[in-house]
Amino acid sequence: MTLQSRWEAVMMNNYGTPPLSLVSGEGAVVTDADGREYLDLLGGIAVNLLGHRHPAVIEAVTTQLDTLGHTSNLYATEPGIALAEALVGQLGTQARVFFCNSGTEANEVAFKITRLTGKTKIVAAEGAFHGRTMGSLALTGQPSKQAPFEPLPGNVMHVPYGDVAALEAAVDDQTAAVFLEPIMGEGGVVVPPAGYLVAAREITSKHGALLVLDEVQTGVGRTGAFFAHQHDGIVPDVVTMAKGLGGGLPIGACLAVGATGDLLTPGLHGSTFGGNPVCTAAGLAVLKTLAAEDLVARAGVLGKTLSHGIEELGHPLVDKVRGKGLLQGIVLTVPSAKAVETAARDAGFLVNAAAPEVVRLAPPLIITEGQIEAFITALPAVLDTAAEDS
């Protein structure tokens, strides 16, 4: 039996049957069950910042697991405290950290923090994606994902993303928080207009509302800054993160700035696995490697190489490329992203249809220039095949 047939027999069908079974990886390359190699331009959906089998992550995890594996949230451990200190240092202002296991969990605790302000109204963005648990789903501005699970937690309104006037009209003195992604990831790699996050900071400050930035996909250096909001020079009240933080291990974090970090008091929230010493050791290894190899700045440079290279092809199926750093979206002239994903896979490249007309690229930050050039060189034939099949 193949892995796919075994999957169909025992796994729930929320994902459908995977088109591929992967068995190993090295750097930015993965290998399937038939021994075929693929250039991983998706990175486990923006997770594998250091690629596969990175020695720093392997050493950190192995050493920690051989020392102390799990303690629960009842006890302090060195890796958890050290990673929290490092994240606060990256944020550049006084803050407190809550560790969990995923991005949606990080957004759930952020949601709870907003309720502790004494206000309940939340403003989020149309098309946004904040996760699939009930609170995060209420924040998500995609009705098709919400409808099967309604009623959801209430008093959340959605406004057009990037529209300062709409945001200003929606936020008032009864607003607890505004939730935004610095760049929409699942929504199609949508970059807001210049000045949007600055305006959001000004609007929320004016009305005493929290500005919560979901950096689950954009954080940990992917966009060419450790946090994507740092491109705009602002300081939010709450930042959520996950994905790349653990180098492939499950970890999420919610950072709350200043007095906002004091709102959670004993008994109000918890996570048995959150801050697990093995996962936080992996996170420390990721941060140390980013610094040692200057991978954050490198992501900014390689992102331009990738986006400019694709646009310079002048292919009729490509309208434009948008994004920052190594989070890029190829915007197509027709809604054939799924066909491009399939054609790319057949050609040995893993990409993702984030929207009907957008192909998402989120490769490991250790990807080489040669690997990027190989993808750009192969892309015209991939697009031609997709055009024929769609």
Swiss-Prot record:
One of its GO terms (cellular component) is cytoplasm. The keyword Amino-acid biosynthesis applies. Binds 1 pyridoxal phosphate per subunit. GO terms for molecular function: identical protein binding; N2-acetyl-L-ornithine:2-oxoglutarate 5-aminotransferase activity; pyridoxal phosphate binding. Pathway: Amino-acid biosynthesis; L-arginine biosynthesis; N(2)-acetyl-L-ornithine from L-glutamate: step 4/4. Keywords: Amino-acid biosynthesis, Aminotransferase, Arginine biosynthesis, Cytoplasm, Isopeptide bond, Pyridoxal phosphate, Transferase, Ubl conjugation. One of its GO terms (biological process) is L-arginine biosynthetic process. Gene3D superfamilies: Aspartate Aminotransferase, domain 1, Type I PLP-dependent aspartate aminotransferase-like (Major domain). N(2)-acetyl-L-ornithine binds at R132, S271. Pfam families: Aminotran_3 (PF00202). Its EC number is 2.6.1.11. SUPFAM superfamilies: PLP-dependent transferases. It catalyses: N(2)-acetyl-L-ornithine + 2-oxoglutarate = N-acetyl-L-glutamate 5-semialdehyde + L-glutamate. The modification N6-(pyridoxal phosphate)lysine is found at K243. It is found in: Cytoplasm. May also have succinyldiaminopimelate aminotransferase activity, thus carrying out the corresponding step in lysine biosynthesis. Homodimer. This is Acetylornithine aminotransferase. It comes from Mycolicibacterium smegmatis (strain ATCC 700084 / mc(2)155) (Mycobacterium smegmatis).
